[in-house]
């Protein structure tokens, strides 16, 4: 059997079908049935531009790795699946609401490139299986394909709109998982109930006597019957029960996911001392302990007297004052007990790769660290902080680099050149002047026989430089960071009244974050298009001609277009950019 090479992608024996059917509209499609006024309204809608600016730009080839190496049933259209995920999170729809929109909403169908009312691009099972494939691929390779879509779209948008990326800003927010908040004792009981469900009938009968008090009711109901003073004894009892079950079941159930979670809870909350099971104290537990059996990735953090269970999302966007609009350039998701400075240390490299001209990054005080100072110096990025973490020094020592290995150190009353010590640098101050200084008792310089000596290394120089960076900027560039709070608000808008996502787990949070980033960037571009239609004449022409280039790669597709209308292949781009403008 012969296959069209444009439609089917080969990687070894892998067969993958790209969705190009949307490039050729149906003769009896939606456009032919709508009155002229309604058709014009449809073509001016945000969903129509979503189709052009997002749907048509999704690189389906990136997803070919998700499918079989052998000839099999053709895959569902990937661009429709990815675009549906973006629309679902953008509009805060449930999955059921998404399919209702696909079936009955003309605007949603337009956004997905559906030209007729009869077709449905995929069923719910296919939609869920696609997300499972994404998760499996991420688990095996560490690559999030939705992030790749975001990076590809953003790269095109930055280039076409000529957005300056040399100045950017970054901030993070808490994304709480859609899980129940368990107390320690309730979590221990809940895991016993979950473990009992996977036991064989034989094992359920075997352990019925010791498990029956817990499985007859929910964990919350059991906990409700306990008095506060009974909690320590109950935890000790649970520890003995956990040890008995673990020793008896570990060989038979070691491959079960629920048992793996049970084992994790057992090792996190209990320890064996002198052959006796002991309950760990609260101080021995940390934010990385299991928060819920429904989300094994969630971590705990207390911030500003509020308790968070879930993940943390870090967002970076352009911030040059000359830009008429700014776009998100990077999104990172990690455990919420990860310090912002560590997140920045891991992400500044990829951000620099995506936007090589980056030379100034604005953050709040939580992002500063010694490792980051070294990384920023290596990448030639000026780190501007709007605040400084920790207490302010009573006597400041300003260190200025004169040349390689040569520094000038300035205190409130003296300025001296540095000398090289054995491992560090030192600055020697005149002791007579120091005696007259009212700040002498708080000075970090050490008193010696005939001088006062201040010891420092390069990290101290970089720290002082970072703290002073904001003072070296013109006034209009000192307050660039706060605007990213509005971007954070766009991400958190779909959260429920408790500040929780609809989803659970690290990967689903990553999909949410990158889908929302695509949506937010699209919204900004769309609003900018509405305000500057003339600017998009050339860029939309280039966007419009891409479908024709797609078709020209396949003689069969080109022939289909020419048969229907000899001029359609060449006139369609003009209509394309005209409608988008």
Segments the model singles out, each with a brief description of its role:
Residues 2-44:
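N-terminal intrinsically disordered, low-complexity, charged/polar
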Residues 41-83, 456:
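Basic, short loop/linker segments at the boundary and entry of helix-turn-helix/winged-helix-like folds
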Residues 69, 92-94, 136-137:
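N-terminal core-binding DNA-recognition domain of tyrosine recombinases/integrases
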Residues 62-68, 110-117:
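Short amphipathic helix-turn modules centered on a small-residue break
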Residues 80, 106-113:
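General structural concept
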Residues 82-92:
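Alpha-helical support elements that line or immediately flank enzyme active sites
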Residues 97, 102, 116, 128-581:
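Anion-binding and metal-coordination hotspots
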């Amino acid at each position: 059997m012969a296959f069209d090479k444009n439609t089917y992608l080969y990687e070894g024996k892998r067969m993958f079908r790209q969705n190009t059917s949307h490039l050729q509209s149906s003769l009896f499609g939606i456009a032919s049935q709508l009155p002229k006024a309604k058709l014009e309204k449809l073509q001016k809608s945000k969903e129509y531009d979503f189709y052009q600016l997002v749907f048509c730009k999704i690189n389906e080839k990136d997803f070919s790795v998700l499918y079989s190496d052998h000839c099999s049933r053709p895959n569902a259209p990937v661009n429709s699946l990815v675009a549906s995920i973006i629309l679902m999170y953008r509009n805060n729809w449930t999955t059921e609401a998404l399919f209702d929109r696909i079936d009955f909403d003309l605007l949603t169908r337009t956004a997905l490139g559906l030209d007729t009312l009869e077709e449905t691009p995929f069923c719910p099972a296919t939609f869920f299986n696609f997300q499972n494939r994404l998760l499996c691929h991420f688990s095996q390779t560490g690559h999030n394909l939705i992030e790749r879509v975001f990076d590809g779209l953003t790269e095109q948008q930055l280039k076409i709109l000529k957005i300056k990326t040399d100045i950017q800003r970054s901030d993070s927010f808490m994304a709480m998982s859609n899980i129940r908040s368990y107390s320690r004792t309730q979590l221990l009981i809940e895991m016993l109930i979950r473990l009992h469900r996977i036991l064989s009938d034989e094992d359920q009968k075997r352990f019925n006597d010791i498990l029956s008090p817990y499985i007859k009711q929910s964990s919350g109901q059991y906990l409700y019957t306990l008095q506060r003073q009974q909690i320590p004894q109950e935890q000790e009892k649970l520890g003995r029960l956990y040890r008995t079950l673990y020793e008896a079941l570990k060989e038979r159930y070691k491959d079960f996911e629920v048992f793996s979670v049970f084992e994790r809870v057992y090792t996190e909350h209990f320890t064996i001392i002198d052959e006796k099971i002991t309950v760990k104290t609260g101080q021995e537990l940390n934010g990385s302990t299991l928060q819920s059996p429904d989300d094994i990735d969630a971590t705990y953090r207390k911030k500003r007297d509020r308790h968070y269970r879930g993940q943390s999302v870090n967002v970076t966007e352009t911030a040059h004052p000359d830009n008429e609009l700014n776009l998100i350039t990077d999104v990172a998701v990690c455990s919420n007990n990860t310090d912002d400075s560590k997140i920045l240390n891991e992400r500044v490299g990829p951000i620099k790769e995506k936007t090589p001209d980056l030379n100034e990054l604005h953050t709040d005080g939580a992002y500063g660290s010694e490792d980051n100072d070294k990384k920023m110096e290596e990448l030639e990025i000026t780190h501007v902080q709007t605040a400084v973490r920790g207490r302010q020094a009573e006597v400041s020592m300003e260190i200025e680099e004169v040349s390689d290995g040569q520094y000038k150190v300035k205190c409130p009353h003296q300025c001296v050149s540095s000398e090289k010590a054995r491992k560090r640098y030192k600055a020697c101050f005149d002791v007579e002047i120091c005696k007259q200084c009212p700040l002498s008792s708080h000075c970090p310089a050490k008193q010696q026989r005939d001088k006062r000596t201040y010891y420092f290394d390069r990290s101290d120089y970089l720290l002082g430089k970072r703290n002073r960076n904001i003072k070296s900027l013109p006034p209009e560039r000192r307050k660039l960071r706060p605007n990213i709070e509005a971007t954070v608000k766009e991400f958190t808008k779909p959260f429920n009244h408790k500040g929780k996502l609809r989803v659970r787990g690290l990967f689903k949070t990553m999909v949410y974050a990158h889908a929302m980033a695509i949506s937010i960037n699209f919204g900004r571009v769309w609003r900018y298009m509405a305000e500057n239609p003339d600017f998009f004449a050339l860029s939309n022409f280039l966007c419009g001609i891409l479908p024709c280039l797609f078709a020209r790669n396949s003689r069969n597709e080109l022939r289909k277009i020419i048969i229907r209308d000899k001029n359609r292949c060449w006139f369609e781009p003009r209509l394309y950019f005209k409608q988008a403008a």
